[in-house]
Amino acid sequence: EDVATDKLFEKCYDGSALGRPILGTEETLAPITTETMHKYMHEYYRPEDTVIAVSGHFTDDDLDYIADLFSVMTGSGRNQITPAIYKPSLVLRSKKIEQNHLCLSFPGVSALSKDRFTMNLLCNILGGGMSSRLFQSIREQNGLCYSIYTFTTPHQDTGLMSIYTGLGEETERRALERILQELHQFCEDGPAKDEISRTREQAKTTLLMGLENTGTRMM
């Protein structure tokens, strides 16, 4: 599953930082030393680029103390970010395992877009849980996969909406055809009113439950 997702980003954002595996590769990690890490930190870590979030019992003095600790950073460099441009592509990776992993991705919206909330609702309607369209159609009604879900990956200037499914070799073609049928039907008919209402309530519940966790509130 992780390999499929890594390959997905590698091809969709080929040539940009978003297309690189987050853990790096053997070739990129081998030359790194303690000295190069310290040099990078001193050059690029700047107070004005640092966000400190806390949750819990902190006094103003505590926050001032934390801010002072980070104020000594003296970096002045600026990374040049190559714009991530979505590129349609097909990538295959062969591996001798019982289960096949399939990812389909489409251009989404950025983390700053006003449409990001609509995108989240769309994602949940299609594959956000056991009552979603894809889960019911592909897994429950037709038994064509082991798991299926949708997810979004919004970034500063771009985003993806993706469908993941784990399935067997004997059902992958039928599952893909059925997924495409569900997408075409959604584009033609749109969501039902009860789907929108249910998904809105799910989003509200998830938000409220998340606020009970101090770590989630901090993030």
Give residue spans per PLM region:
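His/Glu-based metal-binding/catalytic segments typifying zinc-dependent metallopeptidases
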Residues: 78-133
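M16/MPP (pitrilysin/insulinase) zinc-metallopeptidase core fold and M16-derived inactive scaffolds
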Residues: 128-144
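Charge-rich, well-structured scaffold segments of protease-associated domains
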Residues: 1-77, 110, 140-219
